[in-house]
């Protein structure tokens, strides 16, 4: 963890939790695991205040704990989860994503949980003044939203072991399995191997239990729900749709899934990070191909979302067929008009031949497959159009998807490892282009293509003079985008007899950029804090109950102007921090 990430986390905790929590978090971030007596020495705070700060941070899973036996007594250590602290920046984005994916009421639930950290389902009902039995329309809507949030894993059910670091959980399981095998007469190597396998299997089972579809949900007789509606059948092979209502996630005709009132839930930041990255990928599809194809790709990614968190499928490659996409593609999205007909083509004869060949190929594939249900003419035409959009995605140089077979009018694969690497590469190139210009990105692409290249050879390939590119190369080397390797041709290592090879190391370049992003975001929040401190009296006056909402009546014109200027300044700084966070999302987290 870099010093800039530590500095940013300290600022965020101070901004949202106060000085006491910031002092405790800072000590844990800078010194690692500490006990309460150690924290008292590091922070000079009394024990009760430290305990209150730890409780507040543990409520948001920013601090975890583990109890161990030392000198025949129990000792509790605390450690920070710095990524959870950083996720404070994304709370607003999480609320917006849920409002787009589900509805505004579900977003209100996520907003409430983002302020509380975690809460019982019963507390959520009480906070919004809704009845848990769903006896009125608003309460039924709250029940439905909570069920969908839990079912689609936007909310995770909190277990006591979630407050223990994963490494300590594995250590506890390892000690337990070693105690069981004390009496076994086998070699230590074999015993350790078997224990490692047992620990890995048990951790996998615990994770599978966390991601179970029914985790945090209970069955309720259908008759107990006021004004029950008829259950609608879900399409075969479809993933849970965001527009699906509560009746679409029934287990059977006699019962319905409702949230467990005693379950503690919190926001699943991993799932929401995936949604943000999918939106970023869709943005690049729109830039490279077009709006309609980006809508098709967005739906492809949304269909694959449930599989990303599946325990049974650990492969980074996921597949789907054109027919599966057709059955689940919304009817209100028009993708047919985006495919250019022959009369609009520049070379109508060649385009007509190519389109007819593609349609004939799809017709042959449709005849070869034995589908259980007949496809009408509209669905068949829709499948052909979607297949054309998928072909565009596969033919793109960025390889958003790839074709792997002909099953179901075409089988397509999405490699999320490739997508992560590709997204980082194009985002980094975009950053270099904005910082140093088109010449820099041109040189970077040549160096990436050649691996290691000497400056003279680079000048010949780029059709530039050496003195013109040397400044650009040096500037990129200063930020870590390029590195220089010396290869002497003689033992005296004379500069005239030495090759100087330029090369690019992506991992190191991304890591240095990530540190710089943390540094810049921290400076933005420091500027925001200073701006508020300079106008502290004005802010305190504007936040009075009798003035809030009536600023024009109680504040003088120069105060209103100063307040408006401050809010505009805050908006600009927070917007810039949000844009930088989008880059952090790409370079730090995997899909």
Curated annotation (Swiss-Prot):
Give the matching Pfam families.
HTH_9, POLR3C_WHD, RNA_pol_Rpc82
Q: Which UniProt keywords apply?
A: DNA-directed RNA polymerase, Nucleus, Transcription, Zinc
Q: Which GO terms describe its molecular function?
A: single-stranded DNA binding
Q: Where mainly found? A: nucleus
- Leucine-zipper: annotated segments: 517-538
Q: Which Gene3D superfamilies does this one have?
A: Winged helix-like DNA-binding domain superfamily/Winged helix DNA-binding domain (1.10.10.10)
Query: Positions of the region Disordered?
Result: 220-244
Example GO biological process term? transcription by RNA polymerase III
> Which stretches are annotated as coiled coil?
none
Q: Where in the cell is it found?
A: Nucleus
Q: How does it assemble?
A: Component of the RNA polymerase III (Pol III) complex consisting of 17 subunits. Interacts with maf1.
Q: Which family does it belong to?
A: Belongs to the RNA polymerase beta chain family.
Please explain the role this protein plays, according to its UniProt record.
Answer: DNA-dependent RNA polymerase catalyzes the transcription of DNA into RNA using the four ribonucleoside triphosphates as substrates. Specific core component of RNA polymerase III which synthesizes small RNAs, such as 5S rRNA and tRNAs.
Protein name per its UniProtKB record: DNA-directed RNA polymerase III subunit rpc3
Which species is the source of this protein?
Answer: Schizosaccharomyces pombe (strain 972 / ATCC 24843)
What taxonomic ancestry is recorded? Eukaryota, Fungi, Dikarya, Ascomycota, Taphrinomycotina
């Amino acid at each position: 963890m870099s010093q800039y990430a530590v500095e940013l986390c300290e600022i965020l905790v101070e901004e949202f939790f106060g000085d006491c929590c910031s002092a405790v978090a800072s000590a844990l971030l800078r010194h690692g695991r500490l006990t309460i007596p150690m924290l008292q020495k590091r922070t000079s705070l009394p024990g009760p205040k430290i305990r209150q700060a730890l409780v507040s941070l543990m409520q948001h899973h920013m601090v975890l704990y583990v109890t161990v036996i030392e000198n025949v007594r129990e000792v509790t250590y605390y450690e920070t989860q710095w990524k959870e602290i950083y996720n404070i920046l994304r709370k607003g984005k999480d609320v917006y994503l849920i409002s787009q994916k589900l509805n505004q009421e579900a977003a209100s639930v996520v907003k409430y949980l983002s302020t509380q950290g975690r809460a019982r389902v019963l507390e959520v009902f009480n906070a919004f003044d809704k009845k848990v039995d769903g006896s009125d329309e608003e309460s039924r809507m709250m029940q439905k939203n909570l069920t969908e949030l839990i079912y689609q894993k936007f909310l995770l059910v909190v277990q006591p072991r979630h407050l223990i670091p994963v490494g300590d959980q594995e250590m506890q399981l390892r000690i337990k399995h070693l105690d069981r095998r004390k009496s076994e007469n086998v070699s230590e190597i074999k015993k350790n191997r078997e224990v490692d396998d047992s620990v890995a299997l048990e951790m996998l089972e615990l994770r599978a239990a966390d991601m179970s579809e029914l985790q945090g949900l209970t069955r309720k007789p259908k008759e107990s729900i006021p004004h029950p509606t008829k259950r609608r059948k879900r399409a075969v092979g479809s993933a849970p749709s965001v527009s699906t209502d509560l009746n679409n996630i029934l287990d059977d005709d006699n019962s319905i899934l409702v949230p467990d009132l005693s379950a503690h839930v919190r926001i699943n930041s991993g799932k929401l990070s995936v949604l943000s990255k999918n939106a970023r990928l869709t943005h690049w599809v729109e830039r490279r191909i077009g709006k309609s194809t980006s809508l098709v790709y967005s739906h492809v990614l949304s269909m694959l979302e449930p599989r990303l968190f599946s325990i049974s499928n650990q492969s980074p490659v996921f597949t789907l067929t054109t027919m599966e996409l057709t059955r689940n593609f919304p009817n209100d999205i028009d993708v047919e008009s985006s495919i250019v007909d022959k009369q609009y083509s520049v070379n109508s004869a060649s385009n007509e031949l190519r389109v007819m060949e593609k349609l004939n190929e799809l017709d042959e594939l449709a005849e070869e497959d034995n589908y259980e249900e007949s496809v009408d003419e509209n669905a068949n035409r829709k499948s052909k159009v979607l297949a054309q959009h998928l072909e565009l995605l596969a033919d793109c140089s960025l390889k958003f998807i790839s074709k792997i077979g002909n099953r179901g009018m075409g089988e397509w694969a999405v490699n999320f490892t490739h997508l992560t690497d590709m997204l980082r590469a194009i985002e980094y190139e975009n950053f270099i282009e904005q910082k140093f210009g088109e010449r820099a990105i041109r040189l970077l692409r040549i160096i990436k293509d050649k691996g290691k290249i000497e400056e003279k050879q680079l000048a010949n390939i780029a059709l530039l003079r050496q003195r013109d590119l040397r400044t650009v190369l040096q500037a990129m080397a200063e930020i870590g985008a390029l590195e220089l390797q010396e290869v002497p041709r003689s033992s005296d290592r004379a500069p005239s007899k030495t090759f100087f090879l330029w090369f690019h190391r992506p991992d190191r370049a991304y890591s240095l950029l990530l540190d710089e992003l943390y540094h810049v975001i921290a400076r933005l929040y420091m500027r925001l804090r200073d701006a508020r401190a300079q106008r502290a009296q004005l802010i305190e006056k504007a936040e009075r109950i009798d003035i809030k909402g009536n600023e024009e009546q109680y504040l003088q014109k120069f105060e209103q102007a100063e307040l408006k200027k401050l809010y505009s300044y805050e908006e600009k700084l927070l917007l810039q921090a949000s844009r930088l966070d989008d880059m952090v999302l790409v370079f730090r987290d995997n899909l």
